[in-house]
Regions:
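Acidic/polar-rich alpha-helix caps and helix-coil junctions
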Residues: 1-177
Length: 177
């Protein structure tokens, strides 16, 4: 089905699913929804420790990051530099939490959304099955070629009119007047 410029083609992310967990006839899975994973907790901890006081917390922050990496056999990271460490954490979040809905909110929290999002197109993938049961993958525009825009004011939400009406001293966030 297609809605305006957006297409739904029944391709789904299979992260956390195995063939044994899937009922291929009814297209259902008994897999419970994962609300929070330990890897996310460790990455949150690593980032928070580094932001609080890198000089005091660097050993514990590195340990949290390396616990996530070590779980899948990746080599440990080492750095004496807070900025380099935070780049490591950001990259690890992209890889470890892919497809879980964190990226947009991470970009907002790090105040990188304007740099990363602005001017980008939303892409999809056209998957075509070949006669030999292999597949080809083609990147396609999913939004009619429109460029994404993230304004500085989007870092903060507008305060709802009902809340401001209830309290005349409550001012809206900057950019939402």
């Amino acid at each position: 089905m297609t809605y305006a410029r957006y297409a739904c083609r029944a391709t789904r992310l299979r992260k956390f699913l195995t063939d044994n967990d899937k009922n291929w006839v009814t297209n259902e899975s008994g897999q419970n929804w994962i609300v929070i994973r330990y890897a996310e907790v460790l990455l949150n901890k690593a980032e928070a420790l580094a932001m609080e006081d890198w000089n005091k917390n660097s050993v514990e922050a590195l340990q949290a990051l390396n616990d996530v990496r070590g779980r899948v056999g990746l080599p440990a990271r080492a750095t004496a530099n807070k900025d380099t460490f935070l780049e490591y954490v950001r990259h690890e979040r992209i890889v470890e939490l892919a497809g879980e809905g964190f990226r947009y909110w991470d970009l907002r929290r790090w105040r990188l959304a304007e740099d990363v999002i602005n001017g980008q197109n939303v892409h999809g993938v056209k998957i075509t099955k070949q006669g030999d049961n292999s597949f080809t993958y083609e990147q396609v525009d999913a939004d009619g070629g429109y460029k994404r825009i993230f304004y500085d004011r989007y870092y903060h939400f507008a305060i709802p009119l009902t809340e401001r009406s209830n309290n005349q001293l409550c001012l809206n966030n900057e950019g939402w007047n």
